[in-house]
């Protein structure tokens, strides 16, 4: 597979957080990793990092474990902890792919796992960013009942990021699920208030409310498209901006 990993130019931000859903890493397989997807994503991340942008990533785990609190007879807290461990698997896989491309990265876990990665400490994470390393945050915020979207917003606030980029399987925020409703319309922009009032499910309410309180814009885009992240970083392509 030949991938163009040339440096992207004219980016609009200096430090950003990318939220990568687990489902996006699975590609069309729907479960586990799609190696081509991870390789293309890593190449895209390399372009952005080498353009001078400091980059933090929060990974989900839905490609490995997803289900309601009763899916496997687990109580909700246990269910969430299993999901946190799934994010660690994704984080280590992404780190390996990045370092194969020569991009220094560090995995920081909200749950101590000292045999495989560093424990998340805010000042340490910022220091890694300042040294040019990609910071990959795993295990959510380390507590059950909070989604990885909420973790992404929290980490972006802690690390003073300019914006949050949410890479999913759809190219923005729609009035309804575009996979189920062919008449769904996509928004170029939508306010935090309207997103919450319309009960649109692109992110949970806690995450959106936290972003609103701290005035951090959220850009939703389709991570599966070629060079999607680096293009959106330049304001190109199809995406939705949540702000105001």
Curated annotation (Swiss-Prot):
Stated EC number for the protein is 2.7.4.22
> Which residues are listed for ATP binding in this entry?
19-22, 62, 66, 168-169, 174, 177
| Single Gene Ontology MF annotation | UMP kinase activity
Q: Which reaction does it catalyse?
A: UMP + ATP = UDP + ADP
**What does the UniProt keyword field contain?**
Allosteric enzyme, ATP-binding, Cytoplasm, Kinase, Nucleotide-binding, Pyrimidine biosynthesis, Transferase
Q: Name one GO biological process term.
A: UDP biosynthetic process
Could you name the Gene Ontology cellular component terms for this entry?
Answer: cytosol
**Enzyme's top EC category:** transferase
> Coiled-coil regions in this chain?
none
Q: Where does UMP bind?
A: 61, 80, 141-148
Q: In which pathway does it act?
A: Pyrimidine metabolism; CTP biosynthesis via de novo pathway; UDP from UMP (UMPK route): step 1/1
Q: Which domain of life is it from?
A: Bacteria
Subcellular location(s) of the protein: Cytoplasm
Looking at the record, which segments are called Involved in allosteric activation by GTP?
27-32
Signal sequence span per UniProt?
none
Question: How does its activity get regulated?
Answer: Allosterically activated by GTP. Inhibited by UTP.
InterPro entries according to UniProt:
AceGlu_kinase-like_sf, Asp/Glu/Uridylate_kinase, Uridylate_kinase, Uridylate_kinase_bac
Purpose: Catalyzes the reversible phosphorylation of UMP to UDP.
HAMAP family assigned to the protein according to its UniProt record, in alphabetical order: PyrH_B
Q: How does it assemble?
A: Homohexamer.
What family does this belong to? Belongs to the UMP kinase family.
What name has this protein been given in UniProt? Uridylate kinase
Organism expressing this protein natively: Anaplasma phagocytophilum (strain HZ)
The upper taxonomy is: Bacteria, Pseudomonadati, Pseudomonadota, Alphaproteobacteria, Rickettsiales
